[in-house]
């Protein structure tokens, strides 16, 4: 699969690095996508498209004491024949191809490693994602309102924080996650209570 990657050191102090890439991507339907009963679709096409991304990362710290690192990335993908499972009126789900999807957004990551004492270590990681995934295909019918809408079950925003406190062989882990609302219908309809999954924490 053709791909091009480039890194450039902006500053040795703080290890600031700019990164960029472009790639052509393919994904074939899985056996479940094709033959699962009921609902498999043997007529599915493979996904294919082009992805671009660029970003910057840094890392600072003091050996044996602490380190702090972070990264910000922008990405932009154009995918044809995106495979998505959708409910049917027959009571089961089936996969179908969406002619064109534009997925883009920003991802932020940061992490801290700190050793305050020989037997103690604290690690913390956090990330935030803004990931619109828009159906840009052709309408299936004249009344199709799914074009220009967010894909089903994909949250536009998500975030998580993980903390780990280690003392010798003991470890305490805490994880917090957030997901924004997700639509359950391809036209993002809010007419019924089951038209979306409300934002939630866990």
PLM regions and their residue ranges:
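A generic beta-sheet turn/junction motif
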Residues: 12, 24, 165-169
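Membrane-embedded beta-barrel scaffold of Gram-negative outer-membrane proteins
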Residues: 9-11, 19-21, 27, 47-113, ...
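Transmembrane beta-strand segments that form the barrel wall of outer-membrane beta-barrel proteins
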Residues: 1, 22, 37, 131, ...
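Flexible, solvent-exposed coil segments and beta strand-coil junctions
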Residues: 29-39, 84-92, 137-144, 181-188
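Signature of Gram-negative outer-membrane beta-barrel scaffolds
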Residues: 1-14, 28
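Hydrophobic, lipid-facing positions within transmembrane beta-strands of outer-membrane proteins
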Residues: 2-4, 18, 40-42, 50-54, ...
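Extracellular loop and loop/strand-boundary signature of outer-membrane beta-barrel proteins
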Residues: 1, 36-44, 91-98, 143-150, ...
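Gram-negative outer-membrane beta-barrel transporters
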Residues: 67-78, 96-186
């Amino acid at each position: 699969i053709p791909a091009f990657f480039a890194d450039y050191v902006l500053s040795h102090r703080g290890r600031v690095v700019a990164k960029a890439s472009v790639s052509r991507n393919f994904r074939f339907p899985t056996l479940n996508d094709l033959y699962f009963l009921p609902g498999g679709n043997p007529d599915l096409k493979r996904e294919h498209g082009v992805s671009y991304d660029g970003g910057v990362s840094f890392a600072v710290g003091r050996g044996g004491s602490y380190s702090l690192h972070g990264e910000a990335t922008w990405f932009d993908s154009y995918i044809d024949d995106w495979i998505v499972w959708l409910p049917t009126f027959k009571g089961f789900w089936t996969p179908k191809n969406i002619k064109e999807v534009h997925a883009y957004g920003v991802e932020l990551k940061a992490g801290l490693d700190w050793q305050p004492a020989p037997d103690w270590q604290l690690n913390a990681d956090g990330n935030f994602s803004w990931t619109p995934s828009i159906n840009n295909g052709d309408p299936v019918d004249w009344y199709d309102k799914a074009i220009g809408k967010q894909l089903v079950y994909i949250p536009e925003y998500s975030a998580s924080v993980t903390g780990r406190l280690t003392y010798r062989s003991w470890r305490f882990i805490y994880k917090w996650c957030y997901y924004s609302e997700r639509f359950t219908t391809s036209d993002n309809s809010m007419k019924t209570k089951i038209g979306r999954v409300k934002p939630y924490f866990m």
